[in-house]
Swiss-Prot record:
Functional description taken from the UniProt entry: Catalyzes the reversible oxidation of malate to oxaloacetate.
One matching Pfam family: Ldh_1_N
Oxidoreductase listed as a keyword: yes
Protein name, as recorded: Malate dehydrogenase
Active site per UniProt: 176 (proton acceptor)
GO BP terms, alphabetized: lactate metabolic process; tricarboxylic acid cycle
InterPro entries in UniProt: L-lactate/malate_DH, Lactate/malate_DH_C, Lactate/malate_DH_N, Lactate_DH/Glyco_Ohase_4_C, Malate_DH_type3, NAD(P)-bd_dom_sf
Organism the protein comes from: Desulforudis audaxviator (strain MP104C)
NCBIfam families recorded: MalateDH_bact (TIGR01763), PRK06223.1 (NF004863)
Catalysed reactions, semicolon-separated: (S)-malate + NAD(+) = oxaloacetate + NADH + H(+)
Amino acid sequence: MRRKKISIVGAGNVGATCAHWIAAKELGDIVLLDVAEGVPQGKALDLMEAAPVEGFDCMITGTNDYRDTAGSDVAVITAGVARKPGMSRDDLVSINVKIVRQAAAEIARYSPDALIIVVTNPLDVMCYVAYKASGLPRGKVFGMSGILDGARFRTFVALELGISFEDVTTLVLGGHGDHMVPLVRYTYAGAIPVEKLIPADRLAELVQRTRQGGAEIVELLKTGSAYYAPGAAITQMLEAVLKDKKRILPCAAYLDGEYGHRDICAGVPTIVGAGGIERIIELELTAEEQAAFDRSVSAVRGVLKGLDI
């Protein structure tokens, strides 16, 4: 039986960590691509040499040539300049838009049936760029955002309550940036509404920490941005696709009227399976939640304005 083929564009910390998770879960063969000669080849070889120890069986290939990605089932775009202290995700747009545009076009050229998962920041803008550059149907190009943001909020809630991380569920909507919308109303600890367990003022602090979650790690690392949690979040999306799990996952999706917005990418709850985003779930938001979502989408539009797309 043919193994699934997963191509990762960008062999930096996020791409390499994602490859590690994919290999450990045996989701398929991996192609690790980067412009830096020797880097993807070295990381691929290093990871493959862990196979006899860890007991996974998959081929991992490093390359500088998009032709080696031909026939991919899924491609993940992580390539781009990483954040440094003091930078917002939006500060990366002028550099990363060129990288993502080329990557999406090359993926579509060599793997016209592939799904594309975008990870490069600013995420929602890059997801839109990739969608337009690829020419693929909207459900086949989507971004990793709410899973990571939700994981951060879940972590902070679990630590606050002293409970298992697994027992906290939540939903984060909107852009993957400072205006993201963690929905406290949809946050539960072991099926108990978290509003019953944590005072409102403390919950507001945890929401704000979630919005600044990426920046907090950037400030601590000083040389780059997060990669363990992003790698795990990407892998959860890949598993949903490759195993056709029909998972309900918050993803950056191209909106065509959903939640009152068109021609923009933003984080919304979706059903993810073999077809990519197979359905966008529209929730009835409160007036306050809708206003926050609208502000978040407006921030994404503001970054998109002026780009040649």
